[in-house]
From Swiss-Prot:
Gene this protein is translated from: uppP
EC numbers for this chain: 3.6.1.27
Task of the protein: Catalyzes the dephosphorylation of undecaprenyl diphosphate (UPP). Confers resistance to bacitracin.
UniProt name for this protein: Undecaprenyl-diphosphatase
Species whose genome carries this gene: Colwellia psychrerythraea (strain 34H / ATCC BAA-681) (Vibrio psychroerythus)
GO terms (BP aspect): cell wall organization; peptidoglycan biosynthetic process; regulation of cell shape; response to antibiotic
Catalyzed reactions: di-trans,octa-cis-undecaprenyl diphosphate + H2O = di-trans,octa-cis-undecaprenyl phosphate + phosphate + H(+)
UniProt-listed InterPro entries: UppP
Keywords of this entry: Antibiotic resistance, Cell inner membrane, Cell membrane, Cell shape, Cell wall biogenesis/degradation, Hydrolase, Membrane, Peptidoglycan synthesis, Transmembrane, Transmembrane helix
A Pfam entry, by short name: BacA
Regions crossing the membrane: 1-21, 39-59, 91-111, 117-137, 151-171, 196-216, 228-248, 251-271
A GO-annotated cellular component: plasma membrane
Length: 272
C-alpha cells in the first residue's frame, strides 16, 4: 500500500468504527470501487488495535469501576459480594457479546465468500439506514427515556443479537446496536454509550482472531504501515467518540441516516 492509502484507510477505520455508517463497508469499498489492493491481515490487526485502545482510553474511568465491580461478583477485590449496577452492566456487556462471537465463528466463511460485495453493502446500508431513522424519530418524540439501569439482561441480549447481525458488511455495528437501544427506550446518549462499551470485547475478539490468522500465515509484515495505521486509527477514533457524544443530542442520528441513504443509492447506481 502507498502511504496515502494507509492514511485514508486508517482514518476511515477510526472514524467509521463508532459512527453508525459501517466501518467494514468503507474498508471494503476502496478495493472494489477504486481498485485498491487488499490491505492485508497485518494492517487489519493494526487498525483494530488502534480503535480498541481509543475506546478503552475514552471510557477508562467507567471500565475501571466496572472491572472492580465485576471482580466483586466473583469474590475478588474490595467490592466482594456487593454487586450493584456497575457489576450488572459488566455482566450484560460480557453476555451480550456471546451472540456476535458465535455468529462470527460459525458464519465467517459464508460471510467472506458471499456477503462482501458492493450490492450487499448497498442494500444493508439502505435497509439499516431506514431503521436507524425510524428509531431516531421515535426517540425524539419521547418525553421520557428508560435509564440504562432499567435496560435489563433481556434488553442487553437483544442489543447483543443485533451486534451479531452487524457482521454482515454494510450493516454497521454501532448503527444497529444504537437502533435497538433507541427502540428499547434508551436516550440517544445512553444508546451510544452502551454501544461503545459493547464494542470493546467485540473489537478485542476480532483483533485477536486476526492476530492469530496473521501468526499462522506467511504474510510479510510492513511495520511502518502497521504503526502509522494504528496511530491514525487511534487518534481519529478517539476524536470521533468525543465529538459524536457531544453533538448527538443536538443533531440526532439524521445526518448519518441521510449519509447512508445517499451512499446506498450511489452504490446501486454505480453497480447496476
Amino acid at each position: 500500500m502507498s502511504t496515502l492509502e494507509i492514511i485514508i484507510l486508517a482514518l476511515l477505520q477510526g472514524l467509521t468504527e463508532f459512527l453508525p455508517i459501517s466501518s467494514s463497508a468503507h474498508l471494503i469499498l476502496p478495493s472494489q470501487v477504486l481498485g485498491w489492493q487488499d490491505q492485508g491481515l497485518a494492517f487489519d490487526v493494526a487498525v483494530h488495535v488502534g480503535t480498541l485502545l481509543a475506546v478503552m482510553m475514552y471510557f477508562r474511568k467507567e471500565l475501571g469501576v466496572m472491572a472492580v465491580a465485576w471482580l466483586g461478583t466473583v469474590g475478588v477485590g474490595p467490592e466482594k459480594g456487593r454487586g450493584g449496577f456497575d457489576a450488572k452492566l459488566s455482566w450484560w456487556i460480557l453476555l451480550a457479546t456471546i451472540p456476535a462471537g458465535l455468529f462470527g465463528l460459525l458464519g465467517k466463511d459464508f460471510i467472506e465468500e458471499h456477503l462482501r460485495s458492493a450490492l450487499v453493502i448497498a442494500m444493508t446500508t439502505l435497509l439499516f439506514g431506514f431503521l436507524l431513522g425510524f428509531a431516531d424519530i421515535k426517540a425524539g418524540k419521547r418525553t421520557e427515556h428508560k435509564p440504562m439501569e432499567k435496560l435489563g439482561l433481556k434488553g442487553a441480549m437483544l442489543i447483543g443479537l443485533a451486534q451479531a447481525v452487524a457482521l454482515i458488511p454494510g450493516t454497521s455495528r454501532s448503527g444497529i446496536t444504537m437502533t435497538i437501544g433507541l427502540m428499547l427506550g434508551l436516550s440517544r446518549d445512553n444508546a451510544a454509550r452502551f454501544s461503545f462499551l459493547l464494542s470493546i470485547p467485540a473489537i478485542a475478539m476480532a483483533g485477536s482472531y486476526l492476530t492469530l490468522k496473521l501468526i499462522l500465515s506467511t504474510e510479510s509484515v510492513d511495520w511502518f504501515a502497521m504503526g502509522l495505521g494504528s496511530l491514525l486509527a487511534f487518534v481519529s477514533a478517539y476524536a470521533c467518540i468525543h465529538y459524536f457524544l457531544i453533538l448527538l443530542e443536538k443533531l440526532g442520528m439524521m445526518p448519518f441516516v441521510i449519509y447512508r441513504l445517499i451512499l446506498g443509492v450511489g452504490l446501486l447506481w454505480f453497480i447496476l
